[in-house]
Amino acid sequence: MIAVLIIIVVTNIGNNSSGNNKKPHTYEPWVIEAPEKRAGRRGEHIATEIIKGVLREGDYLFTNISVSYDGKRTELDNVVVNKYGVFIFEVKNYKGQLYGNEDDYNWEKYKDDGYGNTFVKEVKNPVKQVKRQIYILAKYLEGYNVWVEGYVILIRSNSPVQSTYILQSVEDIDRAIHTFKRNHLSRDTVESIKKMLV
């Protein structure tokens, strides 16, 4: 019995050292993702596809970029750069009823589980969040003399406030990125900003 075991071990060692450069299979560790994080990623994907649908020639979309200025760091879900300016889109896929004001640091989210239970959770106010992102990105791009606009897209259209920062429709998104406001960027400026965001 021991001899059979030794033969098997020697055969396996011989197979592994016989010039066969096959790497042993490695298994990826399981990644367990919180449902909120998964819903957020799904919402960002939906919003990105909607934004792509309104893009025109000369519009450039950047997703999930990180910028920092003076020690302040932020991640931007979607940024569009074109001759009309630079536009941030913060995306939220909050499920449930939201309560709060535009200037509140947090909002409250009420969600029913279908069994008569209601759960309350504090969530970040995306309007406050996008205002901070506007500040950081504007400072990051300060040398280009560009006005940065920022908007919130709530995938479930459940905003507790009426705000110019919150876009409600595809038409709102199209109008936001294709209307002359404070900017008219040259092609060279657009190219320079693109390089800063890559």
Outline where the language-model segments fall.
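Surface-exposed interaction regions that form or flank ligand-binding interfaces
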Residues: 1-74, 81-86, 92-102, 106-198
